[in-house]
Amino acid sequence: MSVISMKNLLETGVHFGHQTRKWNPKMAPYVFTARNGIHIIDLQKTVQKAKEAYDALKKLTSEGKKVLFVGTKKQARGAIEREALHSNMFFINNRWPGGLLTNWNTVKKSIARLKKLEAMEADNSFEKEVKTKKEVLTLRRELEKLRKTLGGIKDMATIPEIMFVIDPKKEEIAVKEARKLGLKIFAVVDTNCDPELIDYPIPGNDDAIRAISLFLETMSNAVIEGTGGVVEQPRFSEDLDSEALALEYQGEYDESGKFIMDEDADSKKSKAEEPVIPTAEEPAITTIEVDQNE
């Protein structure tokens, strides 16, 4: 039994990969076709790999293993934090602190500093620690910086056994550290990623907000089920990615999170508006009908 329906995958744009000129050939087994300069991901493979990842994550967490959710791109930050907290696990959703895993003893000192500053804030003792308003302001800025970077792992006593990543290409440093230490790595891999670096790759769009939410909510459920909690239905429809959907994902997200149409996408856009005649072997993605009861 699948853990994500084909209907939900289509609705959230999971099948839209990157432009063909940006692909990683190692993703070939997961590509269905190319259409208007964009690779279309084989959703049958996504269903299969999502099920494998779900079952493995459920089993590992049932054994008491902990998960670190990682996703620092703007469109992933909210869902990363929400689903990590929902499953009572840990997260990094801003900048990855280099050496977080490989230099853990140093990172623990920074976490201890964060907790000390939070305790000082709670009992209003900043003024007792320093003498001037400028020094108080410096402490508060230090607190906010540490909270932003390490807030999602401040209760992480040891290095976790599992990492779940959105966009392992962007989070390549995190993936390298995890591989070096032997963590089990789960990740959503778009057509520009190297799936061979991941223990449990799930082929899919790692840029669309709703696709990211669908994957994270589903895998959060695997953790909750593994730890004996109550599983909820994915709530991905609460997130909307209408701008990218209107442009048929023919572009990239910039650092501010705005979806920008690619420089050569205008001509592709006009071609995309032409009707696509499906064949028996290759149904048009834009005309797939899905059983509403699936």
From Swiss-Prot:
Residues 261-274 have a biased composition (Basic and acidic residues). InterPro entries: Ribosomal_uS2, Ribosomal_uS2_bac/mit/plastid, Ribosomal_uS2_CS, Ribosomal_uS2_flav_dom_sf. Residues 261-294 are annotated as: Disordered. Keywords: Ribonucleoprotein, Ribosomal protein. PROSITE patterns: RIBOSOMAL_S2_1. One of its GO terms (biological process) is translation. It comes from the Bacteria. CDD domains: RPS2. One of its GO terms (molecular function) is structural constituent of ribosome. GO terms for cellular component: cytosolic small ribosomal subunit. Belongs to the universal ribosomal protein uS2 family. This is Small ribosomal subunit protein uS2. It comes from Leptospira borgpetersenii serovar Hardjo-bovis (strain JB197).
